[in-house]
Amino acid sequence: MNKYQAVIIGFGKAGKTLAVTLAKAGWRVALIEQSNAMYGGTCINIGCIPTKTLVHDAQQHTDFVRAIQRKNEVVNFLRNKNFHNLADMPNIDVIDGQAEFINNHSLRVHRPGGNLEIHGEKIFINTGAQAVVPPIPGITTTPGVYDSTGLLNLKELPGHLGILGGGYVGVEFASMFANFGSKVTILEAASLFLPREDRDIADNIATILRDQGVDIILNAHVERISHHENQVQVHSEHAQLAVDALLIASGRQPATASLHPENAGIAVNERGAIVVDKQLHTTADNIWAMGDVTGGLQFTYISLDDYRIVRDELLGEGRRSTDDRKNVPYSVFMTPPLSRVGMTEEQARESGADIQVVTLPVAAIPRARVMNDTRGVLKAIVDNKTQRILGASLLCVDSHEMINIVKMVMDAGLPYSILRDQIFTHPSMSESLNDLFSLVK
């Protein structure tokens, strides 16, 4: 049996970063990855990097086939770089295969050439998440039905794209494919569009999408999916929709089933997520879990912060925990992007705080005029007693950069006036934070 001080399952952000750190500290490390197409993890191969590359090229009105080619070039470069960052280190063995727990120290790795057993003093799970496929008749057997990974590898642009699910992934793909020139229809089962956002923000997003030619159908309860005359037929209670391709955007769930975590005494919840404490220990005392597999926020920067927590315990003072996280921002890379941090207005009012809500139309921002995109709105919620920012929603060009400035002020516990009176370059989108927070009375 091959013995290692650390065995890491999954080549994601936390896993690959931890592998390098431990190897540099002198540990003997094995990293197990079930697919050589996933070196580097979800973000590089089927998530952030390929989608944002396509979003960029769609905004430039690049030919779809050429955009797919460039996306592949970017992904292949980063995948190869990530592989060699680990494989070329003397203390790391990269092992291809699917890992399965035998017990809390031993793993069986299923490989085409024969199984391999590995022993790890400490084991770290970073297997990520996988697409949820709703139990709709025909969804797994009908040609032209894709998850996000499949859609990223299309050979030609669909004339009409249907999207089953109106969440953030659905919105991002809808905006992207509309920019490439597809007709897009979003089918959302709920009666409310983007329920986690304030209604004014969600309404602005819906208007922007509709102006791009995207149809949004709410209360769309799909009963079955079929194929007819080279099109996907989507059958719902009151209507039928024919599309050239259908994206299933119904969320993602932790990828744990094939691990058989129960063999190692690892508890999972009802969604298959590995149960962890504030320092990411599982219920097996020598095993940790990091990233999407824990069922928390599915962002690569959360996976990276999970790595920091584990690194601090193994090589540092052991003081870091998930409690250290304050305000976690996120961005939806539609065109223009939505970025948010902290509370919504609805959440702030429900908390009982004495608040002010201010909004600024993007059309009032000089830089937006320069960039010829005046769509959207900036919104902030301020606590009248503490003068601190409780939350912000930025729907505008470059919001994915601006939101990090707001987050830093919030995390530092500084008053909103810091942004009101800050000196920013001109003309820039960030200087609009001066104007937004000048509206606070």
List the predicted regions and their residue ranges.
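Beta1-alpha1 glycine-rich phosphate/pyrophosphate-binding loop at the start
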Residues: A6, F11-F77, M176-R196
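Rossmann-like dinucleotide-binding cores of NAD(P)H-dependent redox enzymes
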Residues: G40, E73-R79, F83, L152-N153, ...
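Glycine-rich dinucleotide-binding loop and its adjacent helix/turn
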Residues: C48, T127-K183, L187, I216, ...
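Flexible, glycine-rich terminal cap/loop adjacent to redox cofactors
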Residues: I9-A37, T42, I49, T53-L54, ...
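Beta1/beta-strand and adjacent pyrophosphate-binding region of the FAD-binding site
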Residues: M1-G12, L157-G167
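A Rossmann-like FAD-binding core segment of flavoenzymes
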Residues: D93-D96, E100-R111, I118, G181-K278
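N-terminal Rossmann-like dinucleotide/flavin-binding domain of flavoprotein oxidoreductases
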Residues: N2-Y4, T42-G120, E197-A220, E345-Q347, ...
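FAD-site-proximal beta/loop scaffold in flavoenzymes
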Residues: T141-L157, Q240-E317
